[in-house]
């Protein structure tokens, strides 16, 4: 199986006859997608483009479908990406805010259309086509005609309450004529004009990379006065409980919203069939640059709500809608220089410095170059004109150099021989293309390791940025991650520590100034975040240790099996290899890591400062009743709506009964859990197969 990017760049070849290679590829895709989700939603600073993310997700879904034995309920293909900040009150969505599956070409659209026809057994249906706005998803609630709450999508299950900030949007009415409970969903964004105005503000300490980041930062600002000045816009496109309005079609819902003076897009069209959809997509693709705001695709929905339950849902996507994604834009610019950096594992990275260029709404001047072999194989030289495409909101990727535009000024970039941080000799490991710094005392490596320990997937110490960690380490206030837990006793030192900053002047020069690394409030916030991390479950600490091959997913599996760091440290390779998501390389890496006296000392110190070493099961206190023992190790399917979200019910069933939850009814299904407005097709199939139906909310007992 080949994967080709932009029909130019072959990424890898996968031997489809080798199950181990397939599993490794699936695990790598899951790991990468989890990281990309964190970067996009949590950091708002993605390292890959939407297109590249979508390609990874599409490949993962294909492999999981083709090899169901490697499927997992915890795969990122089953989850809605998102992130919940600690700054705002958390609110649980009554109905989860799901994402959409993607289409990338006409073939994908025709397959989507064919799947709909099969699901409803007819071609008598139509579509609604809507621009996909590149903004921040929002849920707004009205009660008695008054706007009472606004919540971001968050992770799809829980979002952030931004009610005060949403009220600053001038086009959104605070009162409507409809006097019953109403929830509407849409997108908050900035027009291109308003984005340019914000970024041209001389008082802005750091420019936003693009309009989406600016909209997100503005809506989630703690000061509503600042939000009001940003002139946010919003358009709405969905009513989760539209049937309560006695409306049966999506296009009619949009007309109803318009009558309530709730803003909707004027580019929405009703199409009688898939050919009409394809024609409309072609029109929007040609005119997308003329929009007053950024759009990153087109949403296609089945118009008639009566078909929705019949068509069904996955745990992540509704099957009655799809998002067509625009192909990535390729542009040319000049490569001026290449920076060499080192990461936490010692791997050497290459960042290209470019002539600044506008690419898909962002000003970009840097690009990633993978590794030195990539530079050499693609014959990329300094001063080349290169083709780049969007590989992130800040960092794009270089596809190739344009040799016919060379003017004689080009220079070969030499392969580095020494670490850019510590000057140690670089080494290329067996069967790897990357160069590594093996010096354990390398300053930059150690800083990156502490940053990884603090990251969301690991100990999740909010507010502890890489710049703060760097200052703490370089000022010898900390020597490793465990030293973070001693900072509470060093308040005077921390507040006295100065950090250098540089401000760019109008004439291109820079002015240096200093300010304290911490003030009283920021010190208190950091210490509270550090203290809070002590009570994390075992898998978070295990992930943060940065043991080779052990990411969060593997750490979870190991934690469930061994229950404590102490038990894992005493486990043999054979015992470790019996755990799902592990293997020979991981077991060897773990045993070697726990055998190292230096690491044993680190664990002793971690225990001493109070870091939790035990696995915490949130369902540990649940006692399974006798009448529910039959659910143990069985396969369930869920249909309809309940007093809890499907993901909550799914998590409960999997954790309490060690059971599997599937998306579709088959001969392997043991139980069908049925809620309100359940789909007729699943019920019919379950009855035909004589599968037991459950209607009681046993998770409440």
From Swiss-Prot:
Molecular function via GO: DNA ligase (NAD+) activity; metal ion binding
InterPro entries hit by this protein: BRCT_dom, BRCT_dom_sf, DisA/LigA_HHH, DNA_ligase, DNA_ligase_AS, DNAligase_adenylation, DNAligase_N, NA-bd_OB-fold
SMART domains in the cross-refs: LIGANc (SM00532)
UniProt cofactor(s): Mg(2+); Mn(2+)
E.C. number(s) listed in UniProt: 6.5.1.2
BP terms from Gene Ontology: DNA repair; DNA replication
GO cellular-component term (any): cytosol
Amino acids binding NAD(+): 50-54, 99-100, 130, 153, 187, 301, 325
Record has DNA repair as a keyword: yes
Highest rank taxon of the organism: Bacteria
UniProt KW Manganese keyword: yes
CDD domains: BRCT_DNA_ligase_like (cd17748), LIGANc (cd00114)
Domain BRCT: 626-701
PROSITE patterns: BRCT, DNA_LIGASE_N1
Residues bound to Zn(2+): 419, 422, 437, 442
Catalytic activity: NAD(+) + (deoxyribonucleotide)n-3'-hydroxyl + 5'-phospho-(deoxyribonucleotide)m = (deoxyribonucleotide)n+m + AMP + beta-nicotinamide D-nucleotide
Entry keyword set: DNA damage, DNA repair, DNA replication, Ligase, Magnesium, Manganese, Metal-binding, NAD, Zinc
Active site positions: 132 (n6-amp-lysine intermediate)
Family that this chain belongs to: Belongs to the NAD-dependent DNA ligase family. LigA subfamily.
Function: DNA ligase that catalyzes the formation of phosphodiester linkages between 5'-phosphoryl and 3'-hydroxyl groups in double-stranded DNA using NAD as a coenzyme and as the energy source for the reaction. It is essential for DNA replication and repair of damaged DNA.
NCBIfam families xrefs: dnlj, PRK07956.1
Protein name per its UniProtKB record: DNA ligase
